[in-house]
Amino acid sequence: MSPCENDTPINWKRNLIVAWLGCFLTGAAFSLVMPFLPLYVEQLGVTGHSALNMWSGIVFSITFLFSAIASPFWGGLADRKGRKIMLLRSALGMGIVMVLMGLAQNIWQFLILRALLGLLGGFVPNANALIATQVPRNKSGWALGTLSTGGVSGALLGPMAGGLLADSYGLRPVFFITASVLILCFFVTLFCIREKFQPVSKKEMLHMREVVTSLKNPKLVLSLFVTTLIIQVATGSIAPILTLYVRELAGNVSNVAFISGMIASVPGVAALLSAPRLGKLGDRIGPEKILITALIFSVLLLIPMSYVQTPLQLGILRFLLGAADGALLPAVQTLLVYNSSNQIAGRIFSYNQSFRDIGNVTGPLMGAAISANYGFRAVFLVTAGVVLFNAVYSWNSLRRRRIPQISN
């Protein structure tokens, strides 16, 4: 038992702050290595333009693929053993893997370690499950929206810090620094997260069929998983072509990398500002209204992105899109809280994470395929169509049910 754990009532607000810090540290740790990932692949012996592109794409995607496979297993274990121990397992496991990545000698070792990183991940979905089971239901939207800003903040600062560290100390030391950040996350979680959890034996665990029957609305929960997948597909589809699209818009300028970095970052800044506020609004008017409105707003912003003429126009639209995106996943997570019990929260949030990871893999592939065949601008129009389908699909699923009465 950690020093923070005793018989006093759990202070969920303090747990939220500590979980936010943990999500921030893991978000930063994951994104620290992203700016130089292709350079590290090249340093490990991969040469040639096409081979470098292929291997960079594979080592990037394989983490999400294995995370999607492993998430349900870890979610089930969290429902049996508790969420805090899963947070500790994830932070420590990822820290050890990061050290090994810094010691990798060839691309195959690095590929296996990237897959292992995905297998051992799961800090964020378990943090979501922990907070969702402790926070009063009528504050779920605000709490989960606030928690989501932790990972976003870390992901925003990580690439900048990673690039500076790589330039100053070289590529391999950044992996060791990243491991140190994750070990720090482990100790913060160990000493400052409190959870009162009664372990459940394997025989007492609900099986998959029982999990489904225990849900208040199984079809709605499945539709929310699909919504999460499509949100990530839409977000990821733009990532592979953004820098090239900015270069096309900017023309012959010397600082295209800086401009691209700014435009890539502004949605995260907007989401950071909007997520807690829209989450709080969702607690008042209903997360389903926030979800549908944000999806429609996203469609209305994606379409003109296909017709912009300057990087500034694209940047403004991306900022507004980020404000809408900041409401989407917290709204989905709040609806999952409303429609499932604490007994299965670990598995529900882990299933949702699996769908999110699948979206992270398929989104960039879709964007790259569309841009290769139809040009950069077509990506935004197709993505708008995908999000519009998501809005109609979500509205159709949500209108068939009423949110249960919420109480403290």
From Swiss-Prot:
| Major subcellular site | membrane
Print the keywords alphabetically.
Antibiotic resistance, Cell inner membrane, Cell membrane, Membrane, Transmembrane, Transmembrane helix, Transport
Please state what the protein is called: Multidrug resistance protein MdtG
Pfam families, per the entry: MFS_1 (PF07690)
Q: Does the keyword Electron transport apply?
A: no
Instruction: Classify the protein's membrane topology as the record does.
Output: Multi-pass membrane protein
Quote the NCBIfam families the UniProt record gives. PRK09874.1
Q: Which SUPFAM superfamilies match?
A: MFS general substrate transporter
Q: Where are the transmembrane segments?
A: 16-36, 58-78, 92-112, 115-135, 146-166, 173-193, 224-244, 256-276, 290-310, 319-339, 378-398
UniProt keyword DNA-binding, yes or no: no
Instruction: Output the GO biological process annotations, alphabetical, semicolon-separated.
Output: response to antibiotic
CDD domains hit by this protein: MFS_MdtG_MDR_like (cd17391)
Q: Which family does it belong to?
A: Belongs to the major facilitator superfamily. DHA1 family. MdtG (TC 2.A.1.2.20) subfamily.
One of the record's GO cellular component terms:
plasma membrane
* Stated role: Confers resistance to fosfomycin and deoxycholate.
A GO molecular-function annotation: transmembrane transporter activity
Q: Which PANTHER family does its entry note?
A: MULTIDRUG RESISTANCE PROTEIN MDTG (PTHR43414:SF6)
Question: Where in or outside the cell?
Answer: Cell inner membrane
InterPro entries the record matches: MFS (IPR011701), MFS_dom (IPR020846), MFS_MdtG_subfamily (IPR050497), MFS_trans_sf (IPR036259), Mutidrug-R_MdtG (IPR023692), Tet-R_TetA/multi-R_MdtG-like (IPR001958)
